[in-house]
């Protein structure tokens, strides 16, 4: 789905990408081949040569789900990642996400099925869903204290 939505900038998906030591497994990573905003800006500002996407098939996201995704982010994976979940998340999730932004400058962009459906519709109409994901980043960044 992310290849369809952002295939012009996200290349070479690796499913269940493992660290060399084999201790961590990431659901999907993409090479960030962007040369335009916002993906290029994120590559430079946050070091995302590879974009991490974690997927959770749960009713509600827990702190551990968010913490796990944030733990993958850092010097080697960059400081922006995506957590895809089935359901809409509430204000409690936004508060938890702000902890990662405030304390570690890690941005976990949470998307759900409805976001993805809306973005697919945009793409089908010939529009670019990049603005929608940039809005998620901006709201998280501006919501930080």
Ranges and model annotations:
Residues 1-145:
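Catalytic core segments in nucleotide and nucleic-acid processing enzymes
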């Amino acid at each position: 789905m992310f290849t369809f939505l952002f295939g012009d900038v996200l290349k070479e998906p690796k499913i269940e990408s493992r660290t060399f030591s084999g201790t961590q497994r990431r659901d999907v990573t993409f090479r960030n081949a962007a040369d335009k905003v916002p993906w290029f800006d994120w590559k430079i500002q946050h070091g995302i040569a590879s974009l991490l996407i974690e997927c959770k098939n749960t009713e509600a996201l827990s702190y551990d789900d968010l913490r796990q995704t944030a733990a993958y982010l850092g010097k080697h994976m960059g400081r922006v990642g995506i957590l895809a979940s089935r359901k809409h998340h509430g204000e409690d999730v936004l508060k938890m996400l702000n902890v990662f932004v405030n304390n570690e400058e890690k941005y976990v962009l949470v998307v759900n099925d409805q976001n993805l459906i809306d973005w697919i519709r945009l793409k089908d109409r010939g529009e670019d869903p990049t603005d929608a994901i940039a809005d998620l980043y901006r709201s998280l960044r501006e919501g930080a204290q």
